Amino acid sequence: MNTRKKILLVDDDLDLLEQNKLLIESKGYEVITAVSGKEGFEVFKKIKPDACVIDLIMEEHDSGFILCYKIKNDEHGKNIPVFILTSAAYDTGFKFGASTSEEREWIKADALIHKPVIIEEFVEKLEAFYELKK
């Protein structure tokens, strides 16, 4: 399992933020939250989390991508998983992913997590990332 890894969760929807925080905490993780891309990066620099989960669309349509880009260009961020949380496929029918190296290079995220979050899928992706790093 995990040794109480810190997860930074960034979402401007306060209800979903709290719901996802409780879901992730139920699996033994410590969750620190932020409600915007700007606050998310400030918290990231301060706490140096073990992973980040970032909503795609917050104050701007590309806020999640921008925050992900900033984190992945930070020395600490290069070595941790960053997941984009999105309901874009559900809302628009437009599907995109992070399964190929080209897609991951473009969006900078290690994986996409579709809303609503299925906690088992999230934990599986997170643990798979750490297994690859061993």
Task: Tell me what each language-model feature is.
Residues 33-42, 63-64:
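Helix N-cap/capping motif at the beta->alpha junctions
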Residues 14-32:
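Two-component/phosphorelay signaling modules centered on CheY-like receiver
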Residues 42, 65-78:
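Short amphipathic alpha-helix used as the core "switch/output" element in two-component signaling
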Residues 47-54, 58:
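Active-site beta3 strand of CheY-like receiver
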Residues 10-11, 34, 52:
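Conserved sequence signature across two-component system core domains
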Residues 62-66, 88-113, 120, 124:
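Alpha4 helix (beta4-alpha4-beta5 surface) of REC/receiver domains from two-component response regulators
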Residues 1-6, 114, 118-134:
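Non-catalytic signal-transmission and effector/linker regions of two-component phosphorelay proteins
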Residues 48-50, 76-81:
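His-Asp phosphorelay/catalytic-motif detector in bacterial-type signaling
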